[in-house]
Design a protein with these regions (language model features):
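Catalytic cores of nucleic-acid ligases and guanylyltransferases
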Residues: 1-194
Length: 194
């Protein structure tokens, strides 16, 4: 963002509500538990949290974010999640009728939810779904760098799936919402019930 100093930016905050009715004007994402940060990708990668404070992110995770980003410079909004556990894999056993579950150890991951800048081009005034499309084009998922999933329909059935995975809250975002760094945006709502 040529006209805005990146170090002065902070993540946008969602408004909190107890309930929200499904609407075609919104998407639904899981509310990840962890440390929210804006990650700058460039010569010196860094993470900035609320109130513009530096987030002490693991160096190897910042390096993984840089490696998985196809742009020279970018600003990503996301969550550093500690203790992330994937679903266990079913592995074939020695015998024809044998199988076992391979448990995957917990690890730290970065889950990207938005893209605010790419190669000096600000995306703050770009609608959310277009920013998500560009995020998917710029950031390649890996075991340690993830893109948050989202849906536009079927909130309740997807909510059931997310609850089974341990999510207790959800974020609904207006599809045409713009990004307002450091502000609370009424078009992003964190909810407990759908």
């Amino acid at each position: 963002m040529k006209d805005v100093e990146v170090s002065n930016l902070a993540p946008q905050r969602p408004r909190f509500l107890r309930e929200f009715a499904e609407s075609p004007d919104y998407i639904l994402e899981p509310a990840w538990r962890g440390t929210r940060a804006l990650v700058t990708v460039g010569r010196v990668p860094a993470a900035t949290g609320y109130d513009g404070r530096t987030v002490d992110a693991p160096r190897e995770l910042l390096d993984a974010i840089v490696a998985m980003t196809s742009a020279d410079e970018a600003v990503l909004d996301g969550i550093f999640v500690e203790g992330f556990v994937e679903e266990s894999d079913l592995e074939p056993g020695a015998g024809e009728d044998e199988a076992f579950v391979r448990r995957v150890p917990a690890r730290s991951v970065f889950v990207a939810v938005d893209l605010l800048e790419v190669d000096g081009q600000s995306l703050l005034d770009v609608p959310l779904l277009e920013r998500k499309r560009q995020l998917a084009a710029v950031l390649r998922p890996s075991p340690n760098v993830r893109l948050t999933p989202f849906v536009r329909r079927g909130f309740r059935s997807w909510r059931d799936t997310l609850e089974a995975q341990g999510f207790k809250q959800f974020v609904v975002k207006k599809v045409n919402s713009r990004y307002h760094p450091g502000e609370t945006n009424d078009e992003w709502v964190q909810v407990q019930k759908l």
